[in-house]
A protein has these predicted regions:
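Post-HEXXH active-site segment of zinc metalloproteases
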Residues: 189-223, 238-247
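Internal/C-terminal transmembrane anchor helices
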Residues: 39-41, 280-306
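Peri-catalytic and regulatory segments of divalent metal-dependent proteins
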Residues: 103-196
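Residue-level signature of catalytic and energy-coupling elements of molecular machines
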Residues: 34, 226, 272
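An active-site-proximal "capping" alpha-helix that borders the catalytic cofactor pocket
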Residues: 135, 177, 220-235
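Membrane-helix interface segments
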Residues: 28-32, 191, 283-287
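Active-site-proximal gating segments in proteases and membrane effectors
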Residues: 140-159, 209, 213, 233-292
Length: 342
């Protein structure tokens, strides 16, 4: 449980730092790199600090107990939070937590496999319907796979395909070019691979709520970068924004894939705001936002990984049945816990 709380705290602090840094960027600047840097750091740092920069709750409890309390309420609360016996009781639920962890990972994995199977069926059906005709089809210079309802989206890891539903082909040529260019930009930038690799962290750590948020921010950054590239190539951001709204209305009943023209759920308003009416930063904000972001990063780098027992690899367990004590333990929790060295 300590590890879960620490990993989420690190991810949330790093995510806030990335959010502030992203906010300080010009509206047309690439954003994905911020999250591509923060996400690996939030994964690697807790594991590295576990072995090289740990903080023992048992030692902190002894030091706190030896000091005069600041007050009855604050003294009792601080001793409770640092009591290894209390944390050891929480650790007794680790078996149940691990079972939930494996169950959630299995459900997410099955959901991902089901989505891949569904896309594979759509591709096979499209190939059969084309018959002897060229597959995939080429529309406005972009190679596409025409579907009944799925899309617009880019799918595939090794070989990306642009999926467009039939109603996209009926759009006016200018609007259709925006849709196809958006998906083609996703394909050229290998956004599908990026989001697939990033989503693996969710399968491995479904309890990491901070990672869910980081992945969502990465998806938004990928879509905003793609919007900027499309507007730079084709121009007229107002027409492009109107198309996004129209596509959202037309595709509301179809399955949602990533990366896609509509992006993640609930991100369309943010994309339109940045694209059509970006809020200019004041001079103070341009310096203050990066400074606060660096401060959060410094806090994370200074925050050790908490462990129950003494030493970076020690942990505390509850004794069952009879009381077992370690050599010269603190009398306040000697009857409840035993410190085992790995």
């Amino acid at each position: 449980m300590l590890c879960i709380l620490y990993v989420n705290a690190v991810g949330m602090c790093l995510g806030l730092a990335a959010l502030l840094l992203e906010r300080a960027l010009p509206s047309m600047s690439p954003r994905r790199w911020v999250w591509c840097v923060i996400i690996p750091i939030s994964i690697v740092l807790p594991g590295f600090y576990r072995g090289h920069h740990a903080w023992s709750i048992a030692d902190a409890f002894e030091q706190q107990a030896a000091r005069p309390p600041l007050g009855d309420v604050f003294g009792t609360a601080s001793l409770t939070l640092l009591d290894p016996g209390w944390w050891a009781q929480i650790a007794s639920y680790d078996t149940s937590i691990n079972r939930l962890w494996l169950t959630a990972s299995a459900v997410l994995l099955l959901w991902g496999l089901a989505s891949a199977w569904r896309v594979s069926r759509v591709l096979s059906l499209s190939r059969r319907l084309r018959g002897d005709a060229k597959w995939p089809a080429t529309v406005d210079g972009v190679s596409v796979v025409v579907t009944d309802m799925m899309g617009p989206a880019t799918v595939g890891f090794w070989r990306s395909r642009v999926l467009v539903p039939r109603w996209v082909l009926a759009l006016p040529r200018e609007q259709r070019q925006y849709v196809l260019r958006h998906e083609e930009e996703h394909r050229r930038a290998h956004d599908g691979r990026l989001l697939f690799v990033a989503s693996l962290t969710i399968i491995l750590m479904p309890w990491n709520l901070a990672m869910w948020w980081l992945i969502r921010r990465l998806c938004l950054a990928v879509e905003m970068d793609c919007d900027n590239r499309v507007v730079n190539r084709l121009g007229n951001p107002n027409a492009y924004g109107e198309l996004l709204v129209r596509v959202a209305q037309a595709a509301s009943r179809g399955p949602r894939l990533q990366p896609a023209l509509l992006g993640g759920v609930g991100t369309l308003e943010r994309r339109l705001t940045v694209l059509l009416a970006p809020t200019p930063l004041r001079h103070v904000q341009r310096f203050l936002l990066p400074a606060v972001a660096l401060g959060l990063v410094f806090v994370v780098l200074s925050m050790p990984h908490p462990v129950l027992g003494r030493g970076s690899h020690a942990h505390v367990t509850i004794t069952s049945g009879t009381t077992t004590t370690a050599p010269k333990p603190h009398p306040a929790w000697a009857a409840d816990v035993v410190v085992h060295q790995r």
